[in-house]
A protein has these predicted regions:
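Accessory, often C-terminal, charged low-complexity segments
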Residues: 1-123, 127-128, 144-148, 152, ...
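Short glycine/proline-rich turn/loop motifs
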Residues: 117-126, 169-177, 433-447
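Conserved proline-anchored active-site loop of SAM-dependent methyltransferases
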Residues: 149-168, 222, 475-489, 598
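Conserved helicase NTPase motor core
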Residues: 124-156, 160-162, 166
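Glycine-rich S-adenosyl-L-methionine
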Residues: 176-195
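Glycine-centered, small-residue-biased loops immediately flanking beta-strands
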Residues: 204
């Protein structure tokens, strides 16, 4: 090393000398044992649409493999750029329209999201999922600005690096002939996993699926990036028929669950019943008498499934908290149809002093929470919560008491038979052929548009292991592919009424053979014909739209059903918005010229509730009626802004536009302590400048 330092000191080019000294410093700090791999040249990414300036790094649009990079040294009035290759001094002039900006990882970037459209089938209070078309490393940098320490589960299915040219490094496919392919893959993954770690909550879990090609390398990398976490490897049988290979027929792939070593049971066990049932919150008090009463014994026709279900009276009992005056909102009728022995619906709660109406209404008999002694008790759940359980079939009639002419209303719960999940999953629902490839073909109306999609149920069960008891979980997938994670999240929400939301990230990569054909036809990156052939435009977005609407892109209803009987054509009552990752100039942001471009970020970071509309006249501040954030544009309007926030306890995030640190501190002190407050545009610019320094 000392000899190298002497040689570097003799280099006359001071800039080159500094770069060589920096590289040597990295070598000296590098570990010599454990997982050792080359960092390689900095990764690069093409930024379609970013304006070209003097000093920009660019490539030619017709250079499919990005073999040559150039530096822009001059711009002319006739829309020409004078460029110089990085490896020579031979300048040439090309039209600006023939060039694309390239960024190296470590160069400062200032990303934003541009909406490409939305689907809203859920109500306005339901948060939106987000599906982002963009380079996942930059998108992860953006998410660390918005969601550091807030993500419940990250599920990723990265490229498996099989040697079959199934992924790119520096815009070039990596194949079996590349002797550095494993090292490149590790370098590629390490950068992204380090950002992913910043996103996770203290009890957040990372799930990574992989096969034998990088299994052991990945395990060591996860140990390095997540040293304070336990790593569990689960084998999932995805191809019961097996692949034709020498010696063994492989039927499985692996999933690493990277779980915080907190001592708590973070991964939730399951049974076959619980996999399709809603979460049940007991809503019981410690002092409630939990001994079953005679009328809680299931009716004869319910005894057959008593091994799987426990039946509990729908009426609270035992403690003082079970009486009507303690919970007046939980005193209401449950209407039943006696002939078919069916619980139909709930009625409205009545005032404490009102007497319950006992007569039939529309042929339905009302059952009130009144015990055998005539005491007014209350039901276990509020009307909305009880109605949700009725619709799921979990509120049933029990025994009929002929003497008192009364019915028992029971709620059924899955018996507590939950066991720890095993490390081998063999379930026909996880077959990637039937529930991945074939399902995707149904939804897109054409086969072969995406290779090897996951079974939706393998993804659902993986997510459920982490978020089953987190109905408002935030889920991220930054190798989104065909959008299976979004579909699985919708299915979990439909099963239990949850409001989990997912953020999916994928690029718009075009398959190699098709990209070459398009280039031969004169269609390049950024051209509509080229982009239409990409994974986001052709697969991810159409699949997510089909999931929500139940319709293919051609308007035809999707045939078939989910396991459990839910028709595909019914879709889901979810909201989802599609975005493109774009890039801003720091000076424009600093001057306050880019608020409209940043508005979707603020909306997404505040929970993605409602819509992100910018009115023509804000009056100095913005507190959207249907969203959960507020923005102050002018300090002089702070008092009415503060008054508006007082009327909106649902607002969670506040952004203050000011150049004064002191004014920001004073306004923060005057705001409620439960608000997340940030300073525009300082915090945004600082974050991405800091990320660039950490990457360099």
């Amino acid at each position: 090393m000392a000899n190298l330092e002497d040689l570097i000191a003799r280099v006359s080019d001071r800039r080159l000398q500094a770069e060589m000294a920096s590289a040597l410093g990295i070598l000296k700090r590098r570990q010599r044992f454990g997982l050792v791999f080359e960092e390689h040249l900095p990764e690069t990414t093409v930024l379609v649409g970013l304006p070209i300036q003097v000093g920009s790094l660019v490539q030619r649009r017709d250079d499919l493999g990005a073999r040559t990079l150039y530096r822009v040294i001059d711009l002319t009035a006739d829309q020409q750029a004078c460029i110089v290759p990085l490896d020579s001094d031979a300048a040439e002039s090309l039209p600006l329209a023939s060039l694309l900006v390239v960024k190296r990882f470590g160069d400062p970037i200032f990303p934003t999201l541009t909406s490409l459209g939305a689907l809203r089938r859920g109500d306005t209070s339901r948060p939106s999922h987000a599906v982002i078309n963009g380079e996942n490393y930059h998108a992860l940098q953006l998410l660390t600005f918005l969601f550091a320490g807030q993500v419940d589960c990250i599920y990723i299915d990265p490229p498996y690096n099989t040697g079959a040219r199934d992924w790119k490094y520096n815009n070039r496919y990596v194949d079996d002939n590349d002797t550095w392919r494993h090292s490149k893959w590790l370098s590629f993954m390490a950068k992204r996993l380090q950002l992913a770690r910043r996103l996770l909550r203290p009890d957040g879990v990372l799930i990574v699926t992989i096969d034998e090609h990088e299994l052991h390398h990945l395990g060591m990398l996860l140990e390095k990036v997540f040293p304070a976490h336990a790593r569990y490897m689960v084998s999932i049988v995805i191809n019961p028929k097996g692949r034709r290979e020498p010696n063994f027929s492989r039927i499985d792939e692996q999933a690493f669950f990277v779980v915080p070593s907190t001592g708590a049971e973070i991964v939730q066990g399951t049974t076959s019943l619980q996999a399709i049932l809603p979460l049940i919150d007991s809503e019981t008090d410690d002092e409630e008498d939990e001994r079953p009463e005679e009328d809680e014994v299931p009716a004869a026709e319910q005894a057959d499934d008593a091994i799987d279900w426990e039946y509990r009276h729908a009426r609270r009992r035992g403690a003082e908290s079970s009486y009507r005056h303690q919970r007046p909102n939980q005193f209401y009728p449950i209407f039943i149809d006696e002939a078919p022995r069916r619980v139909v619906r709930v009625g409205a709660s009545i005032a404490v002093n009102d007497e319950p109406h006992l007569g039939h209404i529309d042929g339905l008999r009302p059952i009130w929470p009144i015990d055998a002694e005539g005491r007014h008790r209350c039901w276990r759940y509020t009307p909305d919560s009880m109605q949700a359980r009725i619709e799921l079939g979990n509120v049933v009639l029990g025994k009929y008491n002929r003497t008192q002419d009364s019915w028992t209303v029971n709620i059924r719960y899955p018996r507590n038979k939950s066991r720890k999940l095993k490390t081998v999953w063999w379930d026909t629902a996880h077959d990637a052929g039937t529930h991945g490839t074939q399902l995707l073909s149904k939804m897109l109306g054409a086969p072969g548009l995406f290779p090897f999609p996951k079974s939706i149920y393998a993804v659902r069960d993986s997510l459920a292991a982490v978020v089953r008891n987190r109905p408002r979980a935030l889920i991220v997938d930054f190798f989104a592919g065909s959008g299976t994670t979004f579909h699985a999240t919708c299915l979990l929400n439909a099963d239990d009424g949850g409001q989990r939301r997912s953020i999916l990230i994928t690029n718009n990569e075009v398959a190699e053979a098709e990209a070459r054909l398009l280039y031969e036809q004169g269609h390049y990156r950024g051209d509509p014909a080229f982009e239409a052939a990409g994974i986001f435009d052709r697969v991810t977005r159409p699949r997510c739209e089909a999931v929500v609407t139940g319709l293919r892109a051609d308007g035809a209803p999707i045939a078939g059903k989910h396991i459990g009987g839910r028709p595909l054509h019914t879709g889901f009552t979810e909201n989802v918005e599609f975005f493109r990752l774009d890039y801003l100039e720091a000076d424009s942001v600093d001057l306050g010229l880019e608020f409209a471009a940043l508005l979707p970020l603020l909306w997404l970071g505040a929970g993605a509730v409602g819509e992100h509309r910018l009115p023509s006249d804000t009056g100095g501040f913005l507190v959207p009626d249907d969203s959960t954030f507020g923005v102050l544009f002018r300090e002089s309007r702070f008092r009415p802004f503060r008054a508006a926030l007082d009327q909106r306890p649902d607002v969670t995030h506040v952004w203050l536009v000011t150049d004064s640190e002191q004014a920001f501190a004073e306004m923060c002190a005057a705001l409620p302590a439960d608000k997340r407050v940030a300073m525009l545009y300082r915090d945004y610019l600082r974050h991405f400048r800091a990320r660039a320094r950490q990457t360099a």
